[in-house]
């Protein structure tokens, strides 16, 4: 289906939407929230035997990718993916430690700290590049 000539004005507006830098970062944050919720639902789905977490898993992942489809119109893919996966990894690890009582070893915590440093560095690099 060729959506370029799709008569629905909502589709046309979505196609034309290119987020500002602030909107792109906000959408990226929203994508991370959806991805983390989806990942928690993956754990709660118990191998897709629990219906609600299984459905929420797919819905949240779809929403995360939908947000990122707009983010990459403004931010570099390398920055988008690194921040998305880095922050998502840290948030998921923290939830794992807290909610699922997973072990929080010194090595795990140091590695999570390194991820945070990397995400801050990438965020700074993208802001320097934009100015």
Task: List the predicted regions and their residue ranges.
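Polytopic alpha-helical membrane proteins, predominantly small-molecule transporters/carriers
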Residues: 2-131
């Amino acid at each position: 289906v060729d959506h370029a000539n799709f008569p629905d004005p909502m589709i046309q507006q979505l196609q034309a939407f290119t987020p500002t830098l602030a909107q792109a970062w906000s959408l990226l944050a929203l994508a991370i929230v959806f991805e983390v919720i989806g990942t928690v639902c993956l754990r709660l789905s118990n191998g897709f035997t629990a219906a609600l977490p299984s459905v929420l898993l797919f819905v949240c992942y779809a929403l995360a990718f939908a947000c990122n489809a707009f983010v990459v119109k403004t931010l570099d893919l390398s920055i988008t993916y690194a921040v998305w996966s880095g922050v998502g990894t840290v948030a998921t690890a923290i939830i794992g430690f807290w909610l699922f009582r997973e072990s929080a070893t010194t090595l795990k915590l140091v590695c999570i700290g390194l991820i945070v440093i990397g995400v801050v560095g990438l965020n700074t690099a993208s802001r320097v590049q934009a100015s």
